[in-house]
Amino acid sequence: GFKNVALSTARGF
């Protein structure tokens, strides 16, 4: 998720 960087880092984009 590019919009949610915090979630992206945890999920791995």
Curated annotation (Swiss-Prot):
Keyword terms, alphabetized: Amidation, Neuropeptide, Secreted
Phenylalanine amide modified-residue sites: 13
Major location (coarse): secreted
GO CC terms, sorted: extracellular region
Tissues expressing this chain: Expressed in the brain, frontal ganglion and terminal ganglion (at protein level). Not detected in antennal heart (at protein level).
Coiled-coil segments: none
GO process annotations (BP): neuropeptide signaling pathway
Cellular compartment(s): Secreted
Disulfide bonds: none
Protein's name in the database: Allatotropin-related peptide
Organism: Periplaneta americana (American cockroach)
